[in-house]
């Protein structure tokens, strides 16, 4: 009996080696900087492409926030401005590698950053969206 066949026989008896179809969903925030030469239609089409990709791979879009055209702190690919887009979504942890590949392949994307949100950041974002003042915001008297 080879090591591989012994290991697969051993692994077949334990459920922790099997893939779990009910994977735990994690909360993420994605910021993408698109090239500023996009038209409004292309900008929206790029956003829809990535939201559809998230949904097609078992994720759920929580909130979408297009910031529009902003100045960059330093030039990226000889561009001094970029179209910013922030997306909050829920997805399994193995999904982010697939999303990264899609973002790197897209010629309209200058930069991107995906961040895993902890429960406090999720609560903060939900409160901020609902209009409830958070601890860091000043309440006008």
Report each predicted region and the residues it spans:
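Structured, basic alpha/beta domains of bacterial-type, RNA-associated proteins
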Residues: 3, 20-141
